[in-house]
Design a protein with these regions (language model features):
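ABC ATPase NBD coupling module
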Residues: 70-86, 110
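Conserved structural motif at the start of ABC-family nucleotide-binding domains
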Residues: 8, 23-25
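Short beta-strand immediately N-terminal to the Walker A/P-loop
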Residues: 36-37, 87
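ATP-binding/catalytic-site motifs of ATP-hydrolyzing domains
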Residues: 63-65, 69
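The feature captures the beta-strand-to-loop junction immediately N-terminal to the Walker
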Residues: 39-41
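Conserved ABC ATPase "signature" region
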Residues: 69-72, 113-129
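Helix-to-loop junction immediately C-terminal to a conserved catalytic motif
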Residues: 54
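Short coil-to-helix segment of the ABC ATPase nucleotide-binding domain corresponding to the Q-loop/switch region
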Residues: 98-105
């Protein structure tokens, strides 16, 4: 697979909660088509990094770009509903009465989805329907 375009870029991102520094100088590049894992011990800032990228929280400093557009910086903040990002951290966040497609589509219900695109992505990820 050719990784030809940068989808997400985070540079020098920092986040603190009170006096507790959770992220310091966090950097990340995610290329189109790449499968990425973020590993670390409990409390190392993995969830915080993802929440910052999704827009659920604002970083204290640094820049986050999505498809070469600045979505979070000192001057810019694009709210989560405009970022076209969805996350499911653990299986307890899934609706047990919905299948894979319906669980994913639930978070996208406010956005226009091209016919067949969701099925295409599910197939690309080798998920069972």
């Amino acid at each position: 697979m050719v990784y030809d375009s940068l989808i997400i870029r985070a540079r020098s991102v920092a986040k603190s909660y009170g006096s507790e520094k959770v992220l310091a100088d966090f950097n990340l590049d995610v290329w189109n088509g790449a499968i990425v894992g973020i590993l670390g011990v409990s409390g190392s800032g993995k969830t915080t990094a993802l929440r910052l990228i999704a827009g659920f929280e604002k970083p204290d400093s640094g820049i986050i770009e999505m498809r070469n557009e600045v979505i979070s910086s000192d001057e810019t903040y694009l709210p989560p509903e405009q970022r076209n990002v969805g996350m499911v951290f653990q299986d307890y966040a899934l609706f047990p009465h919905l299948n894979v497609i319906d669980n994913i589509a639930f978070g996208l219900s406010k956005h226009q989805i091209k016919s067949g695109r969701l099925e295409e992505v599910i197939d690309m990820c080798n998920l069972s329907i």
